[in-house]
């Protein structure tokens, strides 16, 4: 894969993760009240960055050559659904107000995050990347479970800061590494 494209993917991931981390902290506990415009917009930037990462993993065969290519390919189907859900959520006060088609589309978010965990495991096991780039996708894939544990044991405020820190420490970190030294 062209190193310039990998650099761009890294830049998109770093910017998207940083934007969503900042948006998460700024919105804070208000996210519990319903859909927040800043969180939605920065979440869309994050999805664009994650899509670029997954495309890079597929293109560089980071998940392997065999049946494991299905993992990033599946994510390339789910992530546009997550993006579309965010785009279509404007005008609704909360997720409870969604019509049935949006409720169905809403499944793309948690399914894509589960897929990111599976992708992270696969990238780590396959070992096609070296150093931190091998392990950061696994840590990034743990964002959803870590954030949920923080929510359960620490509450909403703790979860906000854990989420932002995890996004910066894993997704943004990985994005910067890819932008500086692209994998092939």
What is the predicted role of each segment?
Residues 1-184:
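Hydrophobic, aromatic-enriched alpha-helical segments typical of multi-pass transmembrane helices
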